[in-house]
């Protein structure tokens, strides 16, 4: 992470506890971190279409919530990187916790009867979210949020590995692709933090078009957005397979993956 550059922008002084490696107000005076902002589109638009498709397919509400939660994270991150205001930072970081809790619920309820509700798990995840929120609002320490978020992601990873190892081995491709994409994003996030000064110096010496490719926090958004979306597909595929539907991963326009399914034929 790096301190803000001495360039004044529309949103005024930075009040967030984090300021990332992208130089502030370089592309436009109306967006503090332009590339870190627009890269959130991958977390906003595709999940909206996923939720719409889910409503049409009459999916369980938990999966509609998962899609919409990812969209909320993207919108919050957009507002945070656009303004670098503390309130907008919370709008980014807290939904990361809430969305992951929804993902955890979906993953651990894949093998239950249709429309069942696990109130004990719901209460546990609600209590976790409430505790993290309360503590984070008081301590305002980003590392605390990162550890709490990491614990949820680690839980999802373990559950996913269990499913592709012991339950549906033929889903390894989708499960491990989701994990690999997410971990690659995490790697670039760390590179952006650790080598920020070197990256900034490099961007000063190369054409802007080339410099954009080193905005690794923006790549973190793209890769974790895609990884999270693929995780929802993996969870949804697992669930509908258990319910004896016939899910298939199809590529819309030959590019974007989506799960399409239909009820099993009755004889």
From Swiss-Prot:
It is a multi-pass membrane protein. It is found in: Endoplasmic reticulum membrane; Golgi apparatus membrane. The chain crosses the membrane at residues 34-55, 62-82, 88-108, 119-139, 142-162, 174-194, 216-236. The gene is Acer3. Zn(2+) binds at residues 81, 217, 221. This is Alkaline ceramidase 3. InterPro entries: ACER. Induction: Down-regulated in immune cells and colonic epithelial cells by lipopolysaccharides/LPS. It is an enzyme of class 3 (hydrolase). GO terms for biological process: ceramide catabolic process; inflammatory response; myelination; phytosphingosine biosynthetic process; positive regulation of cell population proliferation; regulation of programmed cell death; sphingosine biosynthetic process. It catalyses: an N-acyl-(4R)-4-hydroxysphinganine + H2O = (4R)-hydroxysphinganine + a fatty acid; N-(5Z,8Z,11Z,14Z-eicosatetraenoyl)-sphing-4-enine + H2O = sphing-4-enine + (5Z,8Z,11Z,14Z)-eicosatetraenoate; N-(5Z,8Z,11Z,14Z-eicosatetraenoyl)-sphinganine + H2O = sphinganine + (5Z,8Z,11Z,14Z)-eicosatetraenoate; N-(5Z,8Z,11Z,14Z-eicosatetraenoyl)-(4R)-hydroxysphinganine + H2O = (4R)-hydroxysphinganine + (5Z,8Z,11Z,14Z)-eicosatetraenoate. Belongs to the alkaline ceramidase family. Its EC number is 3.5.1.-, 3.5.1.23. The lineage of its organism: Eukaryota, Metazoa, Chordata, Craniata, Vertebrata. Up-regulated with age in cerebeLlum and cerebrum. Its cofactor is Zn(2+). One of its GO terms (molecular function) is zinc ion binding. Ca(2+) binds at residues 19-20, 22, 24, 33. Activated by Ca(2+) and inhibited by Zn(2+). Keywords: Calcium, Endoplasmic reticulum, Golgi apparatus, Hydrolase, Lipid metabolism, Membrane, Metal-binding, Sphingolipid metabolism, Transmembrane, Transmembrane helix, Zinc. Endoplasmic reticulum and Golgi ceramidase that catalyzes the hydrolysis of unsaturated long-chain C18:1-, C20:1- and C20:4-ceramides, dihydroceramides and phytoceramides into sphingoid bases like sphingosine and free fatty acids at alkaline pH. Ceramides, sphingosine, and its phosphorylated form sphingosine-1-phosphate are bioactive lipids that mediate cellular signaling pathways regulating several biological processes including cell proliferation, apoptosis and differentiation. Controls the generation of sphingosine in erythrocytes, and thereby sphingosine-1-phosphate in plasma. Its main location: endoplasmic reticulum. Pathway: Lipid metabolism; sphingolipid metabolism. Residues 56-61, 109-118, 163-173, 237-267 are lumenal.
């Amino acid at each position: 992470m790096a301190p803000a550059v001495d360039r004044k922008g529309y949103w005024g002084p930075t009040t967030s506890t984090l300021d990332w490696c992208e130089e502030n107000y370089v592309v436009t005076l109306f967006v503090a971190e332009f590339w870190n902002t627009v890269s959130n589109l991958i977390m906003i638009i595709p999940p909206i279409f996923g939720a719409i498709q889910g409503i049409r397919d009459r999916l369980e509400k938990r999966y509609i919530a998962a899609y919409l939660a990812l969209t909320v994270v993207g919108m919050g991150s957009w507002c945070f990187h656009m303004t670098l205001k503390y309130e907008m930072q919370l709008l980014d970081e807290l939904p990361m916790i809430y969305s992951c809790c929804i993902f955890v619920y979906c993953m651990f309820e894949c093998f239950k009867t249709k429309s069942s509700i696990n109130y004990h798990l719901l209460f546990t995840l609600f209590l976790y979210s409430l505790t993290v929120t309360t503590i984070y609002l008081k301590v305002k320490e980003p590392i605390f949020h990162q550890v709490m978020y990491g614990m949820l992601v680690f839980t999802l990873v373990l559950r996913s590995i269990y499913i592709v190892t012991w339950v549906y081995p033929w889903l390894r491709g989708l499960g491990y692709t989701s994990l690999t994409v997410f971990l690659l994003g995490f790697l670039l996030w760390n590179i952006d933090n650790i080598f920020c000064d070197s990256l900034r110096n490099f961007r000063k010496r190369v054409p802007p078009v080339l410099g954009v490719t080193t905005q690794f926090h923006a790549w973190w958004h793209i890769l974790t957005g895609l990884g999270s979306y693929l995780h929802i597909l993996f969870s949804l595929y697992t669930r509908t397979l258990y319910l004896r539907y016939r899910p298939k991963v199809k590529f819309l326009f030959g590019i974007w993956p989506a799960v399409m399914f239909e009820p099993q034929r009755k004889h």
